[in-house]
Amino acid sequence: MKNYHRSQELAPRDIVSRAIWKEMQRTKARHVYLDVTHLGATFLKERFPTIYSTCLRYDIDITEEWIPVSPSAHYFMGGVKTDLNGASNLPGLFAAGEVACSGVHGANRLASNSLLEGLVFGYRAAQAASMLLTTGSFPNLLEENFPRKPHGRRMPTQDVEKIRNSLRRLMWSKVGLVRTGDSLQKAVDQIQQWSQKLSAAPFNRPGLETRNMVQVGQCIAQAALWRANSVGAHYRDDFPFYKGLKWKIHSRCQQEVPAKFAAGITKNTRKTARS
């Protein structure tokens, strides 16, 4: 880590993740190694019992052997835009925890804040929802407000699964730890093609979930393409530095008919997600 940050192993998590990724790319390896053997068996077993037992199930004794390490998706810092009570702009819909964009995170997640965020906003959302049940009113949900099951030939479920698996690989390779304008544009173009194909997806759980995954992937890729700078976990290899006050804003993705992406914050709109 001395080649990547002056704090070495104590560097911010996004820098550590990119450092691991770059070493894996340089060496063509599937992982790097973490050596904690110097801490001693007693300390490791008492301080990290879950890690110790998990690695032991894979025949890795962390008191004597190095731990293979690879980056992965850990936390989503965007989400459904809510107020401080977990309320979204859809009456009666509340969100709390990692699914929500409540404003407590910036371009990086605050360390050890996940459980506290769920606890605080889960409690506030429950209070607000309870109050709404007794004092609020809900819109009349007419049948025409819901998507109708389209006619015609449906896409086979196995084709939906292929798109889902391909989307996962695309998001990791093109919209992952290190991004470029070229990789992001390719991702946006491919996701748009999948989005069109999925209009014929079956109205079952795999079909609906894959549609949602493609939609979220499109928002992430488009927001990352628009944000031509690097900040926190969003790292553009072609724009490695954070420059300009114009980037000190959130970006939102709002579904309309048809769905479209709005880069940045425009007049008379609400912020609904973070890039």
Sequence positions of predicted segments:
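An anion/pyrophosphate-binding glycine-rich loop and adjacent beta-alpha core
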Residues: 1-67, 119, 128-134
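Short beta-alpha connecting loops at secondary-structure transitions
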Residues: 5-6, 104-115, 146-153, 172-176
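Flexible, glycine/charged-enriched surface loops at secondary-structure junctions
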Residues: 31, 62-70, 134-143, 200-207, ...
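A glycine-rich dinucleotide-binding beta-alpha-beta segment and adjacent secondary-structure elements
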Residues: 47-100, 206-228, 234
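A glycine-rich phosphate-binding loop feature that marks nucleotide/adenosyl-phosphate handling sites
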Residues: 69-76, 137-152, 234-244
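A conserved FAD-binding loop/helix module that cradles the flavin
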Residues: 90, 102-129
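Long, amphipathic alpha-helical stalk/connector segments used for oligomerization, subunit docking
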Residues: 131-203
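C-terminal amphipathic alpha-helical interaction region
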Residues: 205-275
